[in-house]
């Protein structure tokens, strides 16, 4: 049975032999992040991988991330050690998108501007592109939202209801959730949100903020905008994973901070701060189960199989889906 060090050495050798670009999302296991050429959030990695001069991309993340790279750089080969799903992305597909549009029309919504969070599959991004919409990430969501407001249409935000609600609150707008609010509320809302969510960021509650503030009156609270509106509106800072990292790294070592995002990322920030004055906001382990699936053995096996001409877990998209998804992704990049 090979040790972790044996696997790491073999992986590094295969990466060199195959001339691979290895990228890993911030929420991956530490041993995966350690080997990656680049780590980042979904947008950063999509840009890096699609613009790389490498023809083979190995993406350690969840499925929609690999699809985004394939859509942006269709000629590249994209493989994933594990075809893990994002629970939020699985909450909507092209059929559910069409059904949602039908429900909007039943509520008297004749025109809308769709924004899909990057946590959605390529077919959903393609549908949004067909309706002249755009993709957003947590990092550029405010810029994309401001662009959408200029279209003078009702905004349909999917699939994350929390990010949609938080953006509406940030702009003083009324929001409603499709399938949860009445037809009248949908008709009168400025922003209609699809009823999806992140299972990890739902763990953070207002009570957690109150607990830490009572215990440490000078503590700062930094959270991801996928958290519930009551959490985001009571935090000192809200931002994407990259923005949270930037925020925390600028703090004084003596400044206490509680962070509301995935535990792998928080633990790395704790280590950088010598495990002092840095806390995870929830008492429940905030671990993304699907991000946690990829192991060193998975990475080794997918590289070895590729070298032996037995490639698997390759990302494939239909030409038209890739073309349309790229339109929505490229539009986002131009606007942000």
UniProtKB/Swiss-Prot annotation:
GO biological process: 'de novo' NAD biosynthetic process from L-aspartate
Annotated binding of iminosuccinate, by residue: 25, 42, 117-119, 138, 224-226, 241
Cofactor detail note: Binds 1 [4Fe-4S] cluster per subunit.
Protein function: Catalyzes the condensation of iminoaspartate with dihydroxyacetone phosphate to form quinolinate.
PANTHER family cross-referenced by the UniProt entry: QUINOLINATE SYNTHASE, CHLOROPLASTIC, QUINOLINATE SYNTHETASE A
Protein family per UniProt: Belongs to the quinolinate synthase family. Type 3 subfamily.
Name this polypeptide is given: Quinolinate synthase
Organism: Helicobacter pylori (strain ATCC 700392 / 26695)
Organism classification: Bacteria, Pseudomonadati, Campylobacterota, Epsilonproteobacteria, Campylobacterales
């Amino acid at each position: 049975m090979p040790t972790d060090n044996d696997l790491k050495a073999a992986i590094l050798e295969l990466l060199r032999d195959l001339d691979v670009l290895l990228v890993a999302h911030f929420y991956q296991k530490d041993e995966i992040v350690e080997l990656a050429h680049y780590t980042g959030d979904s947008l950063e990695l999509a840009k890096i991988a699609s613009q790389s001069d490498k023809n083979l991309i190995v993406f350690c993340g969840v499925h929609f991330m690999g699809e985004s790279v394939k859509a942006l750089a269709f000629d590249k080969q994209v493989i994933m050690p594990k075809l893990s799903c994002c629970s939020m992305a699985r909450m909507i597909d092209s059929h559910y998108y069409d059904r949602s549009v039908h429900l909007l029309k039943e509520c008297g919504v004749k025109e809308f501007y769709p924004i899909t969070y990057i946590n959605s599959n390529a077919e959903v991004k393609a549908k949004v592109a067909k309706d002249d919409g755009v993709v957003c990430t947590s990092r550029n969501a405010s810029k994309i939202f401001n662009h959408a407001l200029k279209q003078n249409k009702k905004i349909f935000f999917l699939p994350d209801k929390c990010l949609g609600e938080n953006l509406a609150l940030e702009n003083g707008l009324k929001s409603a959730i499709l399938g949860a609010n009445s037809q009248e509320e949908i008709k009168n809302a400025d922003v209609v949100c699809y009823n999806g969510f992140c299972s990890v960021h739902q763990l953070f509650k207002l009570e957690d903020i109150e607990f830490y503030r009572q215990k440490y009156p000078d503590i700062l609270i930094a959270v991801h905008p996928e958290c519930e509106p009551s959490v985001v509106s009571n935090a000192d800072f809200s931002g994407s994973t990259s923005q949270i990292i930037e925020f925390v790294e600028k703090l004084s070592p003596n400044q206490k901070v509680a962070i509301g995002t995935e535990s792998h990322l928080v633990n790395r920030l704790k280590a950088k701060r010598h495990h002092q004055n840095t806390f995870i906001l929830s008492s429940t382990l905030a671990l993304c189960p699907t991000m946690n699936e990829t192991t060193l053995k998975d990475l080794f096996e997918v590289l070895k199989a590729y070298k032996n001409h037995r490639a698997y877990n390759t990302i494939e998209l239909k030409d038209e889906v890739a073309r349309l998804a790229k339109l929505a992704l490229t539009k986002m990049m131009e606007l942000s």
